[in-house]
Amino acid sequence: MKIRILLCILATLLSYNVSAHDFMVDGVCYNVISEEHKLCEVTFFENESGSVKKNFYKDIVFVPETVEYGGESYYVSVIGGLAFYMQDELLSVVMPGTIRTIKNSAFISCRNIRSIVIPANVTEIESNAFQALESLTYLAVDEGNKVYDSRKGCNAIIETGSNTLLFGCRTTVIPDGVEVIARDAFWTIAPRGNETFSFDIPGSVKVIKENAFSNCEWLSSVTLHEGLEEIGLWAFNGTSIESIVIPKTVKKIEPSAFCNTKLLKSIKVKRGNKVYDSRKGCNAIVESATDCLLQACSTTTIPDGIKIVGEKAFFRIDVKSVVLPASVQEIRKSAFFGSGLQGKLVIPGNVKSIGQFAFTACSGIDELVVEEGCETIGSSAFSLCTSLRRAGLPSSLKRFGVGSVYVLVFDGCDLLENIEIPEQNPYYISNGDAIIERSTMTVVAGTGLGHCQLHIGRKDHRPRKIAKGAFWGMSYMTAVWLPETLEEIEESAFYDCPAIEFIVCGSKVPPLLGKNFGVVNAGPWHLPLQERVVLVVPEGSLDAYKSAPGWSEFRHMVER
């Protein structure tokens, strides 16, 4: 998870205006940033591929006030963007009093850096200047600095005028008087030896901004005090906190504030809070006005009266089963994403809407029953449910795969062998191997185990089109039988189906074939279907297929 996030950040950072060094003095790289004022910045060493050379800087780096270049003397005024990115052998950087600016991600992912002192004349520290510094234990600001401080030896950088804690480390003691904990302030800090740590957030803090403690994997305890008003998006995502008490002064909790907290077992909202509650000892955060369950934990029970299971409410929470009371009407986006649900999942008919990714990656679900009453199922609602074998959908279903140009409701469910929907549904039909939209006779979702037979059953139930991504990620599909009624296969319809050995076409007129309709993206078969499967076409149509766009690329083609 951390690696993926760091890669995403790096991709963003590389779009910033950072460049290789103009010159080097005593092992430190510099760029000239102003000839007129004779100013330069510390920068990174660029390797032959044009990227930052890792571990170029080692031990303690001393940056001087001035350096000589081309017979001229330059003041060192800036620590440049990515200057010390991924310098794992770096222990400390001693910065001179001439430094005015520390740029975006100047110090990021330096695993062994232990101490940083901000000089007195620094007036600007850009966002993400200090991130993922897991060994950092000493963080201070020179007492003469008029913009920033590290009051009371707190081991943090605080913007003095706004009382905003901008950057912290694992030894930070958040001092009373701080009013805001900034975005990414403690992002991915980690102790050595996997020792847990905790934070006591004083009552002066009114706002904890987004990602403030995100991915602090070994943060096991947080104490919130009365006075706190707002908790931002992903604020405590990916931490190891085991319990949380929400003060009665809290007025706003963004979705996913406590997302992906796998060890969380106890949630309580203090009585007297006017916006949120944890009614009936449910071990959850509920938005009182909307009856929306916002955040759950492994011991949550959904109480009667809850109308909405909120976005990411159970995201990666280890729950084996869930009981949805009769009051629940909506399950929102990613509500149970990656949760530990096991066995048969029954979604009662009082649930009218199931959002995108609602049960994605619930690998323990082996049977799905959506009861009569449900009307909408979002795209990827049951994607990557890798144990799912049977799915039953209701006659009340009106909208399937909502929210994406790709339907992908069951993509990656590679053991799925049967999808059923009652004949009386006016919008969709099923032949067991696929769900077909009646109005367009388009396959919107299909099964992936063994032979997929779209050519069987009533002729008026056979499809004319296969939609984008309809069979996406069906790893165990070995053969596809296409009906004589088929007119078009859209792009990526059979994307990442590596086991297909042959395709049997029923139509003498080659259907239109979309771009990348059958590319495999990983494994030994990193080839389009045209390169490796046998295409079987009706007698007398071989020449037509050999000259048709897309079909002509099949290397192995025979007539029946």
Q: Can you say where each PLM-predicted feature lies in the sequence?
A:
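Non-globular, low-complexity intrinsically disordered regions
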Residues: E41-T43
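Structural signature of tandem-repeat unit edges
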Residues: E35-H37, G50-V78, Q87-T101, C110-E124, ...
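Boundary at the C-terminal end of the N-terminal hydrophobic targeting segment
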Residues: V18-D22, G27
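Sec-dependent N-terminal signal peptides
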Residues: R4-L14
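Consensus positions within tandem repeat domains that build extended binding/scaffold surfaces
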Residues: G81-L82, K103-A106, S127-A129, D184-A185, ...
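Helix-loop-beta element that forms the nucleotide-linked donor phosphate-binding surface
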Residues: P549-E553
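A structural signal for leucine-rich repeat
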Residues: Q131, Y495, N516-A522
